[in-house]
Amino acid sequence: IQNYALKQYGGDLALGANGIITSVGMLQVMLIIGIAQGMQPIVGFNFGAKQYGRVQETLRLVIIISTVIMGIGCFCSVAFPELIARAFTNDPALLEVTANGLRICLLVFVVVGSQIAISQFFQSIGIAWKAMFLSLSRQMLFLIPAMLLFSRFWGLDGVWYAAPFSDFVAAVTAWLFLWYHVKSMKGKQEE
């Protein structure tokens, strides 16, 4: 769906730019996935031992670290998109399309770190459906409809703007799931 929209509104240059943007984004996301997966045994063990303070502290630390890493990546992608794109291509037309796409697509990438960490947290404590929902929400549930809608109004920029919209809505959803979970856990601890 994304490649079709990119081809329709931006041609081959948009497809090439998307390959570069995806690579840049995945480099950042892979770091966060590694950190979040490292959190899982710590959270799982302490959750099973009913050491909820340790669980909260571990999750808090991972969210902070993930947000800082993604914040640095987000800043660099928005502030220096041409420089980043030059690591992949020296074609002037592709550089221009890629720089614009990087600036837009990774605009709110800072929130993706917490979204991934929260998703991995739910997997760690055995709430698989929430983890699965959060994992699918960013790249499917919110991205595809936004891309189809936004591209009709704004063309190629609409395809690009669907990514930060999806990232933001998925992060808000993750935080709402976490807030509700913490609230319900406090109620259980008081009983």
Go through each PLM region and give its residues.
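Alpha-helical transmembrane segments of multipass membrane proteins
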Residues: 1-5, 27, 75, 117-121, ...
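Helix-terminus/linker motif at the lipid-water interface of multi-pass membrane proteins
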Residues: 1-23, 27, 45, 83-92, ...
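N-terminal membrane-sensor/transducer module of prokaryotic signaling receptors
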Residues: 6, 129-131, 149-150, 156
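Small-residue-rich hydrophobic transmembrane alpha-helices
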Residues: 18-75, 79-81, 112-131
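Short runs within selected transmembrane alpha-helices of multi-pass transporters and secretion channels
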Residues: 32-36, 105-124, 130-139, 159-175
